[in-house]
Amino acid sequence: WWPALRKNYADPAHLSPEARTPDQRRMYMIHHPARTPSAVVSTCPGHLHMNLLPRLQRRGIGSKLFAVWHAAAAAKGASALHVGVNRENRNAIPFWQSLGFTELTLAGVPEGRTVWMGRKA
């Protein structure tokens, strides 16, 4: 899906980060996505990404979506799972903890805006 997005959105790499609008910052991320640290993938290879609109949060929808995804991942043989959570998203960290995820301790990976969390499948 990255290639399709890249066709629709120009790469604003020619602009300095300070000069980019919020939309251009997102467009830059489409063309230059941050990579998941290898220490995360080697420990917890399965990956899930979930965004819910605020009006849909705290209604059990996220937990139900995770249950369906988790069952499919387990059926395909996933051994452990990871999510990357924005450190500023104070509601997301407790949500993932409620589903059994814990913060991963990663030697050699500097603390950034992403909190890496994992759990056994």
Identify the residue ranges that each predicted region occupies.
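N-terminal start-of-chain detector that recognizes signal peptides
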Residues: 19-25, 54, 87-91
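Short, contiguous strand/loop micro-motifs
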Residues: 39, 56, 79-80
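C-terminal "cap" of GNAT-fold acetyltransferases
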Residues: 44, 86-93, 97-99, 105-121
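Conserved GNAT acetyl-CoA-binding A-motif
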Residues: 44-46, 50, 73-86
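Conserved acetyl-CoA-binding loop-helix of GNAT-fold acetyltransferases
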Residues: 49-52, 58-75, 94-98
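Conserved short-loop catalytic and cofactor-binding motifs
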Residues: 36, 53, 84
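Conserved acyl-donor/pantetheine-binding loop and adjacent beta-alpha core of acyl/acetyltransferases
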Residues: 1-49
